[in-house]
């Protein structure tokens, strides 16, 4: 799931806010560390929200934050947060897919190792689509 983050340079590093996840903040000494810590903070924060019975926060397009005056001096980017471990137990289903589409999915997965297999690919796409709708 892609979440926009807003990174502010401060005297001793970077501070990260996550506008789509209320109350979620992070920091780091370097930009890379700040982004990595933001991914972890988002995952932990959302896990806590779900445990409290709250809804999974919707991710807005990055464009919503790029031109906002409050983020004028910030680096605005996105981080990809794997929330699959929060979705519950996987259930096996059977689906029908046109042969050409299945072939294209397989080709795509072969060149994108972040998608482990067809099921993972389809699950991630469905999750991203439903949570950003």
What are these regions (language model features)?
Residues 2, 43-96, 100-108, 119-120, ...:
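Short, charged, surface-exposed hinge/linker loops at domain edges
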Residues 111-113:
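Short helix-capping/hinge SLiMs at alpha-helix to coil transitions
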């Amino acid at each position: 799931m892609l979440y926009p983050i807003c990174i502010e340079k401060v005297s001793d590093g970077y501070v990260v806010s996550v506008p789509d996840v209320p109350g979620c903040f992070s920091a780091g000494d370097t930009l890379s560390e700040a982004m990595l810590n933001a991914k972890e903070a988002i995952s932990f924060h959302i896990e806590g929200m779900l445990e409290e019975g709250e809804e999974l926060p919707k991710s807005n397009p990055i464009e919503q934050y790029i031109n906002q005056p409050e983020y004028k001096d910030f680096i605005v980017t996105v981080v990809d947060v794997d929330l699959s471990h929060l979705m519950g137990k996987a259930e096996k289903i059977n689906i029908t897919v046109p042969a050409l589409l299945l072939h294209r999915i397989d080709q795509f997965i072969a060149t994108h190792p972040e998608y482990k297999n067809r099921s993972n690919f389809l699950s991630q796409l469905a999750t991203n689509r439903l949570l950003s709708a």
